[in-house]
Curated annotation (Swiss-Prot):
One of its GO terms (biological process) is dendritic cell differentiation. This is Transmembrane protein 176B. It is found in: Nucleus membrane. Residues 260-270 have a biased composition (Polar residues).
């Protein structure tokens, strides 16, 4: 430790001994747990954010295409079952023609979904959603009519075998010939009743199959509507995501203050 002498106005004065310089450096470093949590948050944002990842958009497109093709197939099957129902006895279900118009709207909705997948856009999305809503409404009406035919419209099917009950022809025969003719007519009636019973079961199975197809169309319509709305929401939020990405890029280009510089404090004592 040195001591300096300073002369002021001819008077010698001793200066204070110089003190050593102390520099205190504090360095703050984030813990490994904090870095792990930040990495997990970045991974979650990468996986579940709908507007930033290409696989998510492609997956939605494949789902929409598959649902559209399924709607078309179910619509064609509904029209085919309508043709089968038109060959049966008269019922409200047959007279309404619900199998045809429900199938036609389902085909239109499926075609709209495929067009929307091939040419994405807001207008195509709105048209596809409207067609899907129309298909859902028509298929719900078809379900109501089909259930009503099972509950209340059973009379034509219960008495379908009455066509076999006819009066026996009057044939002037006697003895063995008359007995043989009567047995032949009875046998024909039994065969007719058996065939009519089979036909009644067949039309009941067709109605049950049509009801199952309608239920499947309800499920597919709801799924297609959900995928379409999610796609529309993703397209609406895409400009906001692009704006946020530009802001993040601009923020990265500017030089931010270093955390180590903020946390580092230097104390110089003279």
């Amino acid at each position: 430790m040195t001591q300096n002498t300073v002369i002021v106005n001819g008077v010698a004065m001793d200066s204070r001994p110089s003190q050593p310089t102390h520099i205190n450096v504090h360095i703050h470093q984030e813990s490994a747990l904090t870095q792990l949590l930040k990495a997990g948050g970045s991974l979650k944002k990468f996986l579940f954010h709908p507007g930033d990842t290409v696989p998510s958009t492609a997956r939605i497109g494949y789902e929409q295409l598959a649902l559209g093709v399924t709607q078309i197939l179910l619509g064609v099957l509904s029209c085919a079952l309508g043709v089968c129902l038109s060959l049966g006895p008269w019922t409200v279900l047959r007279a309404s023609g619900c199998a045809f118009w429900a199938g036609s709207v389902a085909i239109a909705a499926g075609a709209g979904a495929i067009v929307h997948e091939k040419y994405p856009g807001k207008l195509a999305g709105y048209v596809s959603s409207l067609l899907t809503l129309a298909g859902f409404a028509t298929v719900m009406a078809a379900v109501v009519l089909c259930v009503n035919s099972f509950i209340w419209q059973t009379e034509p099917f219960l008495y379908i075998d009455t066509v076999c009950d006819r009066s026996d022809p009057v044939i002037p025969t006697t003895g063995y010939g008359w007995m043989w003719r009567s047995e032949e007519i009875q046998r024909q009636k039994e065969e007719c009743r058996a065939y009519m019973q089979m036909l009644r079961k067949l039309f009941t199975a067709i109605r049950a199959l049509f009801l199952a197809v309608c239920v499947l169309k309800v499920i597919v319509s709801l799924a297609s509507l959900g995928v379409g709305l999610r796609n529309l929401c993703g397209q609406s939020s895409q400009p906001l995501n692009e704006e946020g990405s530009e802001k993040r890029l601009l923020g990265e280009n500017s030089v931010p203050p270093s955390p180590s510089r903020e946390q580092t404090s230097t104390a110089i004592v003279l």
